[in-house]
């Protein structure tokens, strides 16, 4: 539960290095999991990421490394194919890596969690005094697309995660919802504010060129009797693509003869997926490929592993912190760059004044 306590061990504090983003937690302090996730997602607090991983790992019957294993297992289950996690903060490690595709899958999954949406959209949050520190800690949103007064503000933005390391450069994962489509944009190895410009361009293209088609308005694929949640079952069609161009794959869930999934693809890319009740008159024990007729189905599985929601929220939230460990470094670099530009401007101004 989000009210569970996260205790900070000495390990969670002592691993910090100079320049690592943190909120000044002490060994022996306790926060709720909810406040911890605010610190992770808004302030990129590295010691909190470690403590969350360690605490949830203990709840799973293990330790910090148990949580790291869970991160890898969860990303594999989501369909990630180019990721491997070795820590819970995103600081550079040759064996800690991901892809834009995988981050989009993770972003789409975590966006289904109400707790994540609430935290990720918050502009500021106050962490109350703890058992050891009698002061309020305030954490502020780093994602500029959420601040109305910022030049990078984007009205459809629903949250995300900023990141930076010297090796990965600027990275940004962003969720957006225009009332019809929900999209995730991922930019990696970008440069400063260009990440926001590039993210906006991705969203503009997505919202202007893709359309959502509801499954309930179309003919069901062979082997499908009904949809578990037809109000949220749909496919997203690329430009100039008809539903009849899609392929449908119907599979029975492990150990079930009545429940399954239908997955629609276009040229190998998944464009929709939905939980279904199977038509037992049709054989679907093995995957059956059928040509789409007039229908589409999609929704991220919103009921995934409800028996361990805290683990999923914590895993994906920390995964979204992939490259946020050195926030202090980017501030330093930006400040240094501004000083350099001011000096260069003064030199140019001085040279102009010296001209006859």
Cite the ranges covered by each PLM segment.
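Domain-terminus/edge residues, biased toward the C-terminal soluble/receptor-binding domains
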Residues: 80-81, 95-97, 101-102, 107-316, ...
């Amino acid at each position: 539960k989000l009210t569970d306590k996260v205790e900070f061990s000495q390990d969670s504090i002592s691993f910090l290095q100079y320049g690592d983003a943190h909120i000044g937690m002490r060994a022996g302090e306790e926060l709720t999991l909810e406040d911890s996730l605010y610190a992770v997602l808004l302030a990129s607090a590295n010691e909190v990421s470690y403590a969350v991983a360690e605490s949830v790992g203990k709840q799973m019957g293990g330790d910090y490394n148990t949580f790291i294993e869970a991160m890898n297992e969860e990303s594999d289950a989501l369909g990630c194919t180019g990721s491997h996690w070795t820590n819970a903060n995103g600081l550079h490690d040759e064996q800690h890596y991901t892809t834009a595709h995988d981050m989009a899958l993770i972003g789409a999954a975590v966006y289904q969690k109400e707790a994540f949406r609430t935290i990720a959209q918050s502009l500021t949050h106050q962490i109350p005094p703890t058992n050891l520190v009698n002061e309020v800690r305030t954490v502020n949103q780093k994602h500029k697309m959420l601040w109305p007064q910022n030049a990078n503000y984007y009205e459809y933005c629903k949250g995300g995660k900023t990141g930076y390391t010297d090796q990965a450069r600027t990275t940004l994962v962003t969720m957006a919802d225009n009332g019809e489509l929900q999209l995730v944009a991922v930019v990696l190895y970008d440069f400063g504010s260009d990440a926001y410009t590039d993210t906006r361009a991705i969203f503009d293209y997505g919202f202007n060129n893709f359309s959502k088609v509801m499954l309930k308005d179309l003919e069901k694929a062979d082997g499908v009797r009904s949809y578990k949640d037809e109000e949220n079952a749909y496919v997203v069609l690329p430009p100039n693509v008809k539903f009849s161009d899609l392929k449908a794959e119907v599979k029975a869930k492990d150990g079930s003869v009545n429940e399954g999934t239908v997955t629609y693809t276009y040229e190998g890319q998944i464009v929709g997926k939905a939980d279904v009740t199977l038509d037992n008159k049709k054989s679907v024990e093995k995957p059956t490929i059928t040509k789409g007729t007039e229908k589409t189905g999609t929704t991220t599985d919103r009921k995934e592993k409800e028996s361990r929601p805290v683990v999923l929220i914590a895993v994906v939230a920390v995964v979204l912190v992939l490259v946020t460990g050195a926030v202090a470094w980017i501030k330093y670099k930006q400040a240094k760059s501004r000083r350099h530009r001011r000096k260069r401007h003064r030199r140019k101004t001085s040279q102009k004044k010296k001209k006859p």
